Swiss-Prot record:
This is Transducin-like enhancer protein 4. Residues 275-452 are annotated as: SP domain. Expressed in bone marrow-derived macrophages. The modification Phosphoserine is found at residues 208, 212, 216, 222, 245, 250, 265, 269, 273, 292, 321, 323, 419. Residues 183-202, 215-252, 273-289 have a biased composition (Basic and acidic residues).
Amino acid sequence: MIRDLSKMYPQTRHPAPHQPAQPFKFTISESCDRIKEEFQFLQAQYHSLKLECEKLASEKTEMQRHYVMYYEMSYGLNIEMHKQAEIVKRLNAICAQVIPFLSQEHQQQVVQAVERAKQVTMAELNAIIGQQLQAQHLSHGHGLPVPLTPHPSGLQPPAIPPIGSSAGLLALSSALGGQSHLPIKDEKKHHDNDHQRDRDSIKSSSVSPSASFRGSEKHRNSTDYSSESKKQKTEEKEIAARYDSDGEKSDDNLVVDVSNEDPSSPRGSPAHSPRENGLDKTRLLKKDAPISPASVASSSSTPSSKSKELSLNEKSTTPVSKSNTPTPRTDAPTPGSNSTPGLRPVPGKPPGVDPLASSLRTPMAVPCPYPTPFGIVPHAGMNGELTSPGAAYAGLHNISPQMSAAAAAAAAAAAYGRSPVVGFDPHHHMRVPAIPPNLTGIPGGKPAYSFHVSADGQMQPVPFPPDALIGPGIPRHARQINTLNHGEVVCAVTISNPTRHVYTGGKGCVKVWDISHPGNKSPVSQLDCLNRDNYIRSCRLLPDGRTLIVGGEASTLSIWDLAAPTPRIKAELTSSAPACYALAISPDSKVCFSCCSDGNIAVWDLHNQTLVRQFQGHTDGASCIDISNDGTKLWTGGLDNTVRSWDLREGRQLQQHDFTSQIFSLGYCPTGEWLAVGMENSNVEVLHVTKPDKYQLHLHESCVLSLKFAHCGKWFVSTGKDNLLNAWRTPYGASIFQSKESSSVLSCDISVDDKYIVTGSGDKKATVYEVIY
């Protein structure tokens, strides 16, 4: 068969031509050739992709180089602005000290010259920047505080703006050291020399690493670049740390200001140098409008049967208080509407202003040789750290209220990668501290906020010592670490010893919080006290931490046994007064003192649970109380405008201090000698207990609702209806730090180790701060 087939199809037959329908002929050599061709194609494609990747890596490196350049430029400019801010503050302080020694005629001339120096127009600024650009062009970039990119602007990669777009900033930065607007030539020359030395140190620290970095970058891959970038950022952080040690805490120096009326427009808070006793210039033109009188209503679920409306001239049966103070004005509804307790109003009294002082107290338009519309502001810390007085220059510079606060905050966030939490108060011209009419301001600078009052009533601004804000036991700032959502207005707070639990008193109950675990958002227990609709006004722990005493809008005090498996009321003390505003415990834990709404001070024997004595003297409600460390002397403040001291051994009144305003809070310094008093007129007064001298402090904008000394006695805090928490140096009142909350701060307490502060506020929460030393 095979032979037949071979005959039919002989091998010598020529093959037919290939037809498209026939299958492709495969051979080993052809397959190898095809594989080789495909391999060469893939190899070429791989080579093309590799070139593309290398090009992208090169562009990435270029982008990173520009990022570092812009970061250096921003950082250097920020440092320069801080330095100039400090120079201006010192020069202002010198003016304030020198001008009063001049004759009245010369004072007017100098004041006018200073005011003219502050008025810098945009046209002048543009001319200055143009001159700097020309000088920069002629000098080929020498002398700039930060390096320029090594590439011409025309050859930059896409999406990179030409360097000319930032040349104005660079020129401005290089110009900062050479200009001053204050006519004191010798001082100016001295500060300029110091400033030049500082600039040289900055350039050697930040510019040189950048130059070496760029020179070697050509032969590095992106991994090497990343490690170098991290190293450089570490060096920049070290530079920042050195400036922080000099008192310019730019990262911590702004306060988060959340206004109830306009939450989108917070304002920079005042901060103060140890060398400068001054107020924020943004609060100097007009007093808050007087508040019309309104009734003070008792907390009640049945207003028709229990509400007691009192006019301003009647005795107050339930002034709003906290752990040791009442809340005095009518910003909030009565407790019956599930909000802040009723408040006692007093019309505002605008202080007198003399022409010389008023001309100097207007906000400085441009207090430094650079314009404010760049929108560069210092930034608060990631964890809500509070300000210390080194360099909060938003308040110092008085950036125009027309400037977009959001844009300014976004600029800070973009430069430093932090949340934009800082803005400006659009109504800053409405703010005025309660400065006495005879001392409305100090010529040449920010008005003083701390005054020494001599025995004959003479007031003088206080020159702060060099160690006012430094040294052992003096905080640098504080940061918010926890928020305790109580659910009702928190009128009373106290901290346990050791620091583990916080007790917050609201409407009808005290809630216990474990702050040793910051993640805990719920109270560990709730102690129902008084009636459900009556506010707790004060709660005090005995030193052993096993017993809590609670008082408020009721005639009874509740004594809680906290050592029981479940906290329980072990006794109740009943008085004849309808309300208790504040409590104090003797150091030996044997006696409790309660401030009654009828003005009496009740003395309770805690062991026998009986009333043993009443101190009578206040003609209106007793609002606040404190006891000396040795337990021999008691201090009380009242709505009758008096502060009284009592001898506990003899049971009699020792002293009486009369004021022109109601007393809402007080604290006795643990180390003795000084008594701090917070008043309705927004003042804090620090009295010497044996001498007639005292200090008067003016940073609060409304009534001072609570006050507490640190246990070391070196500082104290006060809170107010202006939403502020202020920390002061004992006794002269240098401002250590300031926090602004979102509502009236009704109460406060400090832990025994002075490491934590707790505040209670009208927005139904308590806030825990960690004190940073």
